[in-house]
Amino acid sequence: DEMSSRGLGDVYKRQSVNHVVCHGIPGDKILDEGDILNIDVTVILDGWYGDTSRMYFVGEPSMKAKFLTKVTYECLWLGIETVKPGSTTGDIGHAIQTHAETNGLSVVRDFTGHGLGKVFHAPPTILHYGQPNTGDVLEEGMIFTIEPMINSGKYDVKILSDGWTAVTRDKSL
């Protein structure tokens, strides 16, 4: 893999298109005009884990897709803005859930943000829904992801037969 050959360590990539919420397995499917594509990359370097993703549009997206991705991005930043020593994981989730639901969207319950470092899924667990002043208290030096997965329909997901890919149960974006 080109990224590994550049000294970036082990690299794992996932791609999620449209109603694939997360963990989509890369393939040779040709993307269509208006598709939403999320690329999720995990890098392991010298035993340390990194995790990032980025959302793209293929051509011109629908108004619904633009709205969903705009609100999801806002949810991410509202969650980030709550992060400081003494705040809680519930504060993050509450900020995200409130903004999503105020905009008529739903928050996936089955997947979370997570701590990372020498382990990929370490404490704390970052729910993207919840109540303020609940959950783990954040401390200086914690490293974790905030990964809000916001749906235009209901928040229910199902895992496909590959045992990995998660999609919206109602096939909504």
Per-region residue spans from a language model:
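Short solvent-exposed loop/turn micro-motifs enriched in small/polar/acidic residues
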Residues: 22, 93, 129, 172-173
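Hydrophobic, well-structured mid-protein blocks that either form specific transmembrane helices
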Residues: 48-103
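A contiguous pocket-lining binding segment that forms or flanks enzyme active sites
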Residues: 81-149
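Charged, cofactor-coupling segments
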Residues: 30-36, 41-58, 130-173
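Alpha-helical phosphate/pyrophosphate-handling elements in metalloenzyme active cores
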Residues: 14-23
